[in-house]
Every structure is written in structure tokens, then in C-alpha cells.
UniProtKB/Swiss-Prot annotation:
Subunit structure: Monomer.
Gene3D superfamilies, per database record: 1.10.730.20, HUPs (3.40.50.620)
Motif ('KMSKS' region): 608-612
Pfam families: Anticodon_1 (PF08264), tRNA-synt_1 (PF00133), zf-FPG_IleRS (PF06827)
Cofactor: Zn(2+)
EC class: ligase
EC number: 6.1.1.5
Intracellular or extracellular location(s): Cytoplasm
Organism encoding this protein: Pseudomonas syringae pv. tomato (strain ATCC BAA-871 / DC3000)
Protein name: Isoleucine--tRNA ligase
Residues where L-isoleucyl-5'-AMP binds: 567
Amino acid sequence: MTDYKATLNLPDTAFPMKAGLPQREPQTLQRWDSIGLYQKLREIGKDRPKFVLHDGPPYANGTIHIGHAVNKILKDMILRSKTLAGFDAPYVPGWDCHGLPIEHKVEVTHGKNLSADRTRELCRAYAAEQIEGQKSEFIRLGVLGDWSNPYLTMNFANEAGEIRALAEMVKGGFVFKGLKPVNWCFDCGSALAEAEVEYQDKKSSTIDVAFPIADEAKLAAAFGLPSLGKPASIVIWTTTPWTIPANQALNVHPEFEYSLVDVGDKLLVLASELVESCLARYKLEGTVVATTTGQALELINFRHPFYDRLSPIYLAEYVELSAGTGIVHCSPAYGVDDFTICKQYGLSNDDIISPVQSNGVYVESLEFFGGQFIFKANQNIIDKLVEVGSLMDTETISHSYMHCWRHKSPLIYRATAQWFVGMDKQPESGETLRKRAVKAIEDTEFVPAWGQARLHSMIANRPDWCISRQRNWGVPIPFFLHKESGDLHPRTVELMEEVALRVEKEGIEAWFKLDASELLGDEAAKYDKISDTLDVWFDSGTTHWHVLRGSHPMGHETGPRADLYLEGSDQHRGWFHSSLLTGCMLDDHAPYRELLTHGFVVDENGRKMSKSLNNVVAPQKVNDSLGADIMRLWVSATDYSGEMAVSDQILQRSADAYRRIRNTARFLLSNLSGFNPATDILPAEEMLALDRWAVDRTLLLQRELQEHYGEYRFWNVYSKIHNFCVQELGGFYLDIIKDRQYTTAADSTARRSCQTALFHISEALVRWIAPILAFTADELWQFLPGERNESVMLNTWYEGLTELPADFEMDRAYWERIMAVKTSVNKEMENLRAAKAIGGNLQAEVTLYAEDSLVADLSKLSNELRFVLITSTASVAPFVSAPADAVVTEVAGLKLKVVKSGHAKCARCWHHREDVGVNPEHPEICGRCIDNISGAGEVRHYA
């Protein structure tokens, strides 16, 4: 038998079938670095419109986890797609460097007896070390960025910029000193931001406490009685027994009805709706003597259960009837509502009783409980209430309670002297911060859209922002306070600039080593230099002001503005939140035009990642086992608007999808062997109809993908690219062209037409996948024929695709109908192969029985219909002539019949043809193959 292999155009490419991503990706990173890819992108983007994504800085502590990887990959996909869309899309990565976690790490390693200066020195060194580790892990994900020049909140320039931002806020009238209850962690020894609070279940003792009446006549009058006749008490219910020593008032709702209840030996005041449940709890029987409104009880004095002081009734609308007694005990030092109500009733800061120290221990001078830790004192307080006869009931409940996100320990509200940004404080000019922020939210685009309502609710209801902390490792609040009046120095803003200039040169250490006389001269003796530092959310929240300024051509009249902030959904209460507030104070608008949030990563069962559950997916391990491109593909395929499920099995499915895309790319490359686009490319009008359709279909898909990329809908991008590779290419077009590619003359119009289409498709596809499969796209780029620059990223979306003319006979709808017919034929072929009636499609001869309109469509392909159906013979007949055993298809007006060919198989093209062996010189091949080998070659028009 003659070997005709040498006469075929067999596919050939050096592009490897096996990706070997864990080994090849680090080499690609080295190549990007050696060619200066990021710098080249900035050079070619100089005259392009800018797109600025401002990086929310991760905390410089520990190795990266899967959530970090998701965040950085999403950012990279957006910026790569924007680059391909013709924007200059720089990426300046950042790190959040100050704050308690780093200080805590240093204390654990070096002990707690370090000097403040030494602590700062070690914290700075630790943060720098952590940044280097995280940086290499982010780079390994394929994230393009200015990694040599990241912004760090501990860079001297940024520390100085933060001080200048604070000075602007002071100048604008937003900052004030106040005594207010703030979230307080005993382990941190500091106030916490709202974003640093998490809620966990906690067991607490509830107590019902009777406060005896101090003014019997007023209470009797309030209930319309001439006298009480018995001892009377009002009963409160609380879950925090430790706050009873700090009680200073009692709250009732002005509109609720309250009852005076006779329980035998005494009278109790309770909310009318709760009398029955309270008496049941106290195991008492009673009769309602009289009722009144909360309003009538205002300012009536009761006595503290065990201290010699009064507790007046204050009206408060926050009182509820969902639990307890309808009366709330009020400790202004340990509750936000308590504090607010007491201030409304004229209680001064000096009047507020605050016996709990920063470590959670009562001051020694507190009678009965001095020196005790508050949570351990709960039982002693209960015992004291029993002793004085004021305890009505105690129970243990489990309820959601605020905890420190770092130490997981319970928090309290604690009134301390702190620096605040006022949400409703009238600034020097313009609207209040709350009004500005609400308006800014309305002017911002949100992805997903529900983020807008979430952030709006948080801003509408949040308290003033406590910006001060009592720690060493943080940007200082460089204030001088008058020793007698407590007022800020009149030249505070000017002095802050002098401090900023020093910090710019020496870092925050410049403030801490500064002697007040260096700035204040003889005035220094009259002022205290404070040691408070700024909340770390102020650090990251002001980066837009000093990092972004000057980076964007739009919005500079009123300050910088990023096109996009992108972080996890927890940042509505974190970075999005603090950045919004600082932006509205400094520039009167949000520092972003659009906010994108992604969900948290969970396992395939929706559970949080946890070492105890053994379900942690570490990005480092994924890189080493599957490759970063597989992780990137998983990110793209997952709808990030909700929780993002990942597991080894899910990643394996991504790896399978990756192989299908890679195999498609390899098929394209292997069939471009010998193709030189400079000399072999055909104009659209000379291409075969099917090839023109394939290019047109690619153009339509590119438009869809550009839209999806623009809307950050990467899961749509992924699914459409995957379907295009597997179905429209792999399941239709690429199958059909194999015969033409392999069997026609190497430089025939039929083959060059197909190669032209494959070239256009490849040029488009490599760009489509570049934002997602960053490494693979760059590898593919190196194997494409023709002269090209060093990286796919140095280009924009492919512009060589052509659209079918409006009057083209074989238009898009035509090929849709042909595809439907081919699908029906394939289905019947599968049935026959399963029944072993035929071995392969080319053993088949198919007859299509069609209605007139479909006959017209099919007849347009003439004798090339068999190449589209991939059968040795294909004929068309009227629908009415279909025999009884013809198969009814899903295509309206189409039946078909497939029979096994009785003709010999061509040894070259494998078609079963009647003319195999007709030529004695080539007895094993068909006439078409003889013509392609030694004749003028077959002519194709359509497929």
C-alpha cells in the first residue's frame, strides 16, 4: 500500500499540548520582567485616555490567602481588559502598614517591655519584610503592576500626606475632641473602628433589678393616686450586670403605657405590655393599680440599689418592648444611646461616672468592686443585689455580642476622651459630612447594584467617627492642647504642616522625638503634646488624597477621583466607607466613580475556609500543582457578586475547561503551519462562504466580549469563550475544515481561505483570553505566525475581523439553519455508531428529506454539503418523498436517512467514494485526491 502521508498538510506546531503551567509560568514572569513589560505599557499608553483603579491596600501581615488572590486577579483582569480596550490602565499596588496587628506581632516576638521608639522601629522592619513576601506571591498570580514602586502607608511621603489630610479636615471644621462611648477592646487597650468589630454568640447573665422610689409623692401623682401606701420600685432588665455600678438614669419611652402593679408587699412599675411576662418570671401574682404614660414619669427620681445616689427618669425613644421590662437602665459611660440621652438632659462630661479602666478592671476606689475585672465581677454584683433586696430575677442567655476581630474577645462601649470626625457637625462651609456622603453615594455606580443601599444605610446610621487610637505604631495626631483650657493651639493647621515637613524626611518618628519647644518656643510650657495615633482606616482612607493626586486627568479641579475601587463586600464598612468620608471632607465628593464588591470565598458546601474543617484552598499550593492560570480561570468563571465556592474538585473542573481552550488554540496554531500572513492572507471577498461566516461570528462574539469585559461580567466572558471553543469551533467549524485543510493543495485558495480565517480567529482569541489566562495568552502569542511585538498585552482588541455584507446570500441566519441540520445528522450518526451499524461518519451516506425552503438552503452548498455534514455522500430530496423508515428530526420540515456506504474507502482522505481505484496508477485513492496531488486541485466555493 502506498503511503500518502507526505501528500497531506498535516497539522504541525511547537506549541505544547501539555501546559506545564507550574513550571512554565515562573519563566514567563522572568520574561515579562526582562522586557520591562509594565514599563512598556506605560510608554505606549502615554497618549491614551486613563483608567485608574486605586488599589485597596492589603494589610502587611502574613501570607496571602485565597481571598487576596481573588481580589488581585479581579483587578488584574479589569486592567488588562482596559489596556486591550485602548486605555492607559496603570496599577500601583499598595500596602496598609500601621496598626495593632503588626504591633502585636512585634510584642509577641520581642516582649512587651520595649520602648515606644524601639517598637516603631521593629514594626517598620516587620511590615517591610511582610510586604516582600506578599509581593512575590501577588506577582506569581500574574498580576501586572508597578511592583518596584508600590505605595506603602508607612512611606514617609504618605505619612506626611495623611497629616496634611487631617490638617485640611481640622481647617474645614470637621474634627473635634469629645468624651463618647467607643468600641473598646481590653486586649488592644484601644478604641476600635466599626470595621474592626465582629459579632459572635456569647452567654450573658440577665438581671431584673428594682430601683426604689426616692420621690413617692411625684410617682403617686404621675399615676393619678393620692399616695402610694406601700414601698415602690421601678424594674429594669439588662444583659450587662457590670454596668450597674455606673448607672446614672433610667429610660422609659414617652408613648408607652406603664403600670403600677401591686404584688403584695410592694408596688412595681413595669411597661403594661410586659406585666404578665415579668410577673411570671418573678414568680409573683399582682394587680394593676393604675396606668400612665412614660411622658408622665419624666424626671421622677429613684434610688440606686446599693449606692447613695439618685437615678432620674429620662425619656428615650430607643426603649423597646421586645424583651425585658420596658425600662432601660442608663450608664452614659458604657452605652451610645445612654450617653446621648444623658447629654440631652444636661449631664456634663465631668458628671459622667466611668469606673472601668482601659484594661477592663474597675478603679480601686469603686466601692464593693474595686480592682475586679468587670466580667468576673458580674456574679459579685448579682450577689450584692440579692443582699440589698433588689434582684427580681436572673437568667443566662446566649445572644449575639460584639467581639474584637483580632482577639475574638468581647468588647464594651467605653466613654473616653477621643478625637472625632463629626457626621452632623456643621463645618466651616457647606453641608454636614453625613449629607455630603449620602449625596456622594447617589452619584456613585455600584457593582452589584445592591451595594448602594447597603453603604447608604451604613452612612445614614453611623455615629461620629472616632479617629484616635492609643497605640505606638501609627501616624500621630500632631496636636498641642492648652494645659488649662484643653483647646487646640490657635496655629494648629500651620503647625501640622511643619510636622508634615519633618515626617516627610524622617517618618512618624519625627513627631514622637519632637520637643514641643522646637515648634512652640516659649509657649511650649503652656501646651501638652498629645501621643494619640490615627485609626488605621484613616491611613488607607486618605490614600486617594496623597497617592492618587495627579494620576488622573479628570476631576482635579476638586480633587482626584479613581474610576474604580474594587474590594470584598466587607469593605462597605471598611475602606469604601472611610475613603468616602475623607473624600467628602477633602474634595466634597467620593474618591471613586464606581464601586465593585466581590463576595467571600467558601468551600463547595458554602462553609467558610477553616483549618479545622480542612477545607482551606491555599493559592500557593494551587500555583504549584495546577498553575495560576487555572486559579484565574476559576475566578473568571465564578459570579463574584455572591459567595465564591472553591475546592480541589472545582479547580479540577476549571483545569478541564482550560484544557479544552488550550487544545482549541493548539489546533488553530497547528493548522497555521506554513502560513505567512504577509503573503498568504486572502481578502474577505476571496474567502469561502463558511470561512467568511466564521470570521463574522468571531467579530460578533468579540463585540459581546468587549461589552462583558466593560461591565466586569467575567463569568459571561468565560462561558462564551468556552462555548465558542467547544461548540461553534470544535463542534462545527473546525470539524468541517479538517478535510479541506489536510487534503487540498498547500497553497490552494480553499486552504489559504481557511488559514486566513484561522489566523483572524487566533489573533482575536489570544486577546480575548489575555485578561484571564495571562500566562497562556502570552505563550500562545509567541507561536502565532507573522511579525509581532513582545507581548499580547502591548496590543488592543483585534481589528482584522470582517463582517458579512448585509446582502450576503449565506448570511448568519443561513448558517444557523445549517448548524441545526448538522446537529440532527450528528445525533443520528451517534445512534448508528452505538448500534455498530457504522464505524464512523465517513462510512455514512445521508439523504435529507426537506421542505422546499430548506431544500433551497441545502442545495446552495451543492456537492459541498457532504463536507459540512462530514459524510461521504449527502443528497437532498423532497420532504414528501421520505420513506417510512426516515428519521424525524427536531428541525421543522426535515427527515433524514443514513445508510452505510458500499463504496471503497480512499486511503488518503478516508471518504468512501465510487471512484476509488478508477485510476490504475493510484488504485487506493479517489479521483478528488488524485486531482489534489497531481492535477489542478479541487475547487471549493462554500465549505
